[in-house]
């Protein structure tokens, strides 16, 4: 792994995909790219999807909320594709809404709607996401 930010790649699904986006958007100088698969990217309240009370207050949660971070940092993500959003299992609506928001904000991103897969690390999505993070897969 490179020490520079472009060598620090984030990959996750479900809440860890949400976390990958949140990390990159909060620390764009530290991380290069983030890929999320079947993630609740538009989660707008603390405690949803099993996140419990880890954020504490609603004000604290606001500092991690992906939709707010996209809006606040759009200008920093318009030139180079650093956000990757692929496939779905149970969060297709969240992906569609995140994609629409990124389009509206003119954020450069890779979006693939599908294929639908089981909400699991072993359902076959990791290879495609890793290839996209590494720039090894052409857009189909």
How does the language model describe each region?
Residues 1-140:
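Non-catalytic cap/lid and distal C-terminal segments of serine-dependent acyl enzymes
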């Amino acid at each position: 792994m490179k020490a520079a930010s472009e060598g620090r790649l984030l990959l996750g699904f479900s809440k860890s995909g949400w976390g990958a986006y949140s990390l990159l958007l909060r620390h764009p100088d530290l991380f290069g790219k983030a890929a999320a698969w079947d993630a609740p990217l538009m989660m707008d309240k603390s405690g949803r999807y099993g996140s419990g009370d880890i954020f504490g207050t609603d004000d604290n949660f606001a500092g991690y909320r992906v939709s707010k971070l996209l809006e606040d940092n759009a200008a920093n993500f318009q030139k180079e594709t650093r956000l990757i959003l692929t496939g779905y299992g149970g969060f297709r609506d969240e992906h569609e809404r995140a994609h629409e928001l990124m389009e509206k904000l003119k954020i450069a991103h890779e979006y693939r709607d599908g294929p639908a897969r089981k909400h699991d690390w072993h359902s076959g999505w990791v290879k495609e996401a890793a290839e996209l993070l590494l720039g090894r897969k052409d857009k189909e």
